[in-house]
Amino acid sequence: VLSAADKSNVKACWGKIGSHAGDYGTEALERTFCSFPTTKTYFPHFDLSHGSAQVKAHGQKVADALTQAVAHIDDLPNALSALSDLHAYKLRVDPVNFKFLSHCLLVTLACHHPAEFTPAVHASLDKFFSAVSTVLTSKYR
């Protein structure tokens, strides 16, 4: 459960990301593909090379979904319902992959914003990404 402080930390951090969200989403995806190669199996039709237009486009989708989640942080299930349906029923993404991507998002954000990435912000973002992952996998059951 996200506390008021967690929500504040997430909103403040995401506000500083601003126009870089798509770039960070792309970088996190690339990190995920490199660190967890099995995640590539969900993208057989993609050019997965560094700087690929397809990876950039999907990185932007990830960033847009997270921006939507931040904007509706008090109602994640409704905000992410359509995305949850897509991943559970159509794409059938293994839930562990959300954990992998979450980890790579944390690494990416820490690399780009080391001064702001305090232990409290790290914990808040980790809880937020976990909450998003929980919602995205909630329809698997």
UniProtKB/Swiss-Prot annotation:
Organs and tissues of expression: Red blood cells.
Organism encoding this protein: Lynx lynx (Eurasian lynx)
Gene3D superfamilies in alphabetical order: Globins (1.10.490.10)
Lineage summary: Eukaryota, Metazoa, Chordata, Craniata, Vertebrata
GO BP terms: hydrogen peroxide catabolic process
Complexes and interactors: Heterotetramer of two alpha chains and two beta chains.
Matching PANTHER family: HEMOGLOBIN FAMILY MEMBER (PTHR11442), HEMOGLOBIN SUBUNIT ALPHA (PTHR11442:SF48)
Modification Phosphoserine occurs at: S3, S35, S49, S102, S124, S138
Residues with PTM Phosphothreonine: T108, T134, T137
Sequence positions bearing N6-succinyllysine: K7, K11, K16, K40
Similarity comment: family membership: Belongs to the globin family.
Annotated keywords: Acetylation, Heme, Iron, Metal-binding, Oxygen transport, Phosphoprotein, Transport
Presence of keyword Nucleotidyltransferase: no
Binding site for O2: H58
CC terms in the record's Gene Ontology section: blood microparticle; haptoglobin-hemoglobin complex; hemoglobin complex
Function, in words: Involved in oxygen transport from the lung to the various peripheral tissues.
Binding annotation for heme b: H87
Domain of life: Eukaryota
PTM-bearing positions, type N6-acetyllysine: K16
Phosphotyrosine modifications at: Y24
Protein name, entry field: Hemoglobin subunit alpha
Ranges where the Globin domain occurs: 1-141
Alphabetized GO MF terms: haptoglobin binding; heme binding; iron ion binding; organic acid binding; oxygen binding; oxygen carrier activity; peroxidase activity
Transmembrane segments: none
